[in-house]
């Protein structure tokens, strides 16, 4: 069992409306974790502190969980400090406690009172009074899938970087394979590149390496290779090209392995995936719906309304105003992994004529606010649809969005029309007399 601080500390303070009279604040570091349990006495307006310090090893985290249970503390609040909070959160969750992770901006300590024990006490005070906004932490199974997907995205970025390095090497060697092949990293092109790397400066017949389904004629490919082959090819560039291609092959192999593992684990969420695939743009690639579900989680009850959901994803303007002055309306930086995916889907869907409810809204906003703001508005349409279909368990319906007023039922009086024309700088001339009109009746 952990040892608490040698002297328990009491404070006389009226915390006002206390939501959690018994809670704990954790100040997490790489090696040490400072814990402070707050016990509030409503009658005496008194705070009783019980503090301790533990290391971040697994056995010590289990002892920390038992220490919290012995002291009757069920709710624990901590900052989202890098990756350090993850093992602490997992250990407390496995022990049946209710840990809460919050953004550091909600837990800033007053200047001049900064220390690790004071940080833990401040976190406990803020959480007890309900001043902490909890971050969305999905279930453990989704968290594990999320880490795999994000790791796969990092590897795909590395694969793209290695493709660019390989293209630069081919350009330096004078091999203009992109002029004759649509895909430089296709089967035929890679076979030719591998032979050039293995036999530098040697001229050869490309016919055995080119697939029969390849569109460019053999003569054209042969001519392109013969012009580029040179006995004085730089050995360093060839080595760099070979290493870039090896890294590319390893990355693509890892991506396929991760995709297979993720797809297998996502079998438990088939119902939610089928619903998400009914949304326009999410039915082309099955892995797209998986990525979205892994980021948002299968349960929409954690978001009270679709507005909260869209705000969490970072596809709505933030509010920043003071003294009747609006300082900014830009979208937040939330949704680092979800937002780029939605933007790519939106750019493809708005070009389609199969979904007028989306393309009409996009064109209407684009004319007023610009292209990217209209794309973000379409992303919000996607999230609104996903929140509703997952909450209600119903597939996507195009008539779920408000119909667009096409302007056919607009009406204006003659006097209003004449006043509008005059406001635009036009002089109204009578058709019969040719004289300028001065009243609405003369213009008719």
Locations of regions flagged by a protein language model:
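A detector of single, family-specific signature residues
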Residues: 1-444
